[in-house]
UniProtKB/Swiss-Prot annotation:
The keyword Electron transport does not apply. The gene is ERF1-2. The lineage of its organism: Eukaryota, Viridiplantae, Streptophyta, Embryophyta, Tracheophyta. It comes from Brassica oleracea var. botrytis. Heterodimer of two subunits, one of which binds GTP. Interacts with OR. InterPro entries: eFR1_2_sf, eRF1_1_Pelota, eRF1_1_sf, eRF1_2, eRF1_3, Peptide_chain-rel_eRF1/aRF1, Ribosomal_eL30-like_sf. GO terms for cellular component: cytoplasm. Directs the termination of nascent peptide synthesis (translation) in response to the termination codons UAA, UAG and UGA. Modulates plant growth and development. Belongs to the eukaryotic release factor 1 family. It is found in: Cytoplasm. The keyword Acetylation applies. Transmembrane segments: none annotated. It comes from the Eukaryota. This is Eukaryotic peptide chain release factor subunit 1-2. Gene3D superfamilies: 3.30.1330.30, eRF1 domain 1 (3.30.960.10), eRF1 domain 2 (3.30.420.60). The modification N-acetylalanine is found at residue 2.
Length: 435
């Protein structure tokens, strides 16, 4: 998967996590503000609106609710002062007083520029945060290439979301099969084959021109659909002339009754299901490749928290694969006697075991300096280790096996490593597996 696509997937994971946290938050009265400003909105407009809202809220009869609402509006106003103008992709702001699980009130504020433009405009004061508008950020904007090829010509197009675009089309005049006998028949057959070959060659060359990004030498589409009414599409897909980088991206070869734009529309309809499952297919391929490394015992794989983190620190991991719901926290702990900082990773069960928070040799208490979900740490830090980060689900058979059998964390390595030779821990850092 291209780096840009992997980065987008991580941004989507961050938004999913944020939505989950926001949706579960509850407040007393209407003290929780949800504010979304689309690109090209004016900060001055929203500042004025908040000023008007402050005046209205001053009349709320309940003193407690009035104070909470006024506090939330003030908080939103303060946050907006940090922005001279609305960022390129818009601005999302959630602020207010929420009630914790233990019944205590806590002020929270989240503000960020989305990773892609958000088209919603929203202002609501309620006892919960409204996150519905953020869902549009989770929709895939993958671009797919379409090549519609028949005996009359070829069309090159792309589809992204609901937007289809024709990149180029050209017509071709191929000789028909001939009824003449003798020498002519052979000559005509040869000419026909030659023209046909040239047609496939031209289509293959244009496909590289339209679907390979010259800057990165990588495909600029998430997948390719080949369509047509004759067997040209099959011939193209199997041809040596067709770029192998694009060959690897073929998702489907479909029969359509027409060429040109009508054929393009028909190909989109016939491929709808496979396009909606593309993430699923990519995930199956990724984990399948990982399992292949294991079955062939190449030594270019790791699994489990401990080994994966060791390999990561060494810069050996090329692709880090993590289950998107991995429930492990990363702790930075300070030895109360020596002052030494150690890093440990615990699952839910280990967090309740107090012996994990005492030094094994001296029984000195290990004080928590920092605690954060390991997934979040990966999302923030993975680039530092020169790897790509892929979040996977447990919805496919492969994904489920990866989560159950390998603890939901592993990596494919740049080079062969025997993890057993790295039993000596370095830098005084202690990694504890979640199993």
């Amino acid at each position: 998967m291209a780096d840009q696509e992997a980065d987008t997937n991580i941004e989507i994971w961050k938004i999913k996590k944020l939505i989950k946290g926001l949706e579960s938050a509850r407040g007393n009265g209407t003290s929780m503000i949800s504010l979304i400003m689309p690109p090209r909105d004016q900060v001055s407009r929203v500042t004025k609106m908040l000023g008007d809202e402050y005046g209205t809220a001053s009349n709320i009869k309940s003193r407690v609710n009035r104070q909470s609402v006024l506090s939330a509006i003030t908080s939103a106003q303060q946050r907006l002062k940090l922005y001279n103008k609305v960022p390129t992709n818009g601005l999302v702001l959630y602020t207010g007083t929420i009630v914790n699980d233990d019944g205590k009130e806590k002020k929270v504020t989240f503000d960020f520029e989305p990773f892609r433009p958000i088209n919603a405009s929203l202002y609501l004061c309620d006892n919960k945060f409204h996150t519905g508008a953020l869902n549009e950020l989770l929709e895939s904007d993958d671009k797919f290439g379409f090549i519609v090829m028949d005996g009359n010509g070829t069309l090159f197009g792309t589809l992204s979301g609901n937007t289809r675009e024709v990149l180029h089309k050209f017509t071709v005049d191929l000789p028909k099969k001939h009824g003449r006998g003798g020498q002519s028949a052979l000559r005509f057959a040869r000419l026909r084959m030659e023209k046909r070959h040239n047609y496939v060659r031209k289509t293959a060359e244009l496909a590289t021109q339209f679907y390979i990004n010259p800057a990165t030498s990588q495909p600029n589409v998430a997948g390719l659909i080949l369509a047509g009414s004759a067997d040209f599409k099959t011939e193209l897909s199997q041809s040596e002339l067709f770029d192998p980088r694009l060959q690897a991206k073929i998702l489907n070869v479909v029969d359509v009754s027409y060429g040109g734009e009508n054929g393009f529309n028909q190909a989109i309809e016939l491929s709808a299901e496979i396009l909606s499952n593309v993430k699923f297919i990519q995930e199956k391929k990724l984990i399948g490749k990982y399992f292949e490394e294991i079955s062939q015992d190449t030594g270019k794989y790791v699994f489990g928290v401990e080994d994966t983190l060791k390999a990561l620190e060494m810069g050996a991991i090329e692709t880090l694969i993590v289950w998107e719901n991995l429930d492990i926290n990363r702790y930075e702990l300070k030895n109360s006697t020596s002052g030494e900082i150690v890093v440990k990773h615990f699952g839910k069960d280990q967090e309740t075991d107090q012996s994990n928070f005492h030094d094994a040799e001296t029984n000195a208490e290990l004080e928590v300096q920092e605690k954060m979900p390991l997934l979040e740490w990966f999302a923030n830090e993975y680039k530092r280790f020169g790897c790509t980060l892929e979040f996977v689900t447990n919805k496919s058979q492969e994904g489920s096996q990866f989560c159950r059998g390998f603890g939901g964390i592993g990596g494919m390595l740049r080079y062969q490593l025997d993890m057993r030779t790295f039993d000596e821990l370095s830098d005084g850092e202690v990694y504890e597996d979640s199993d």
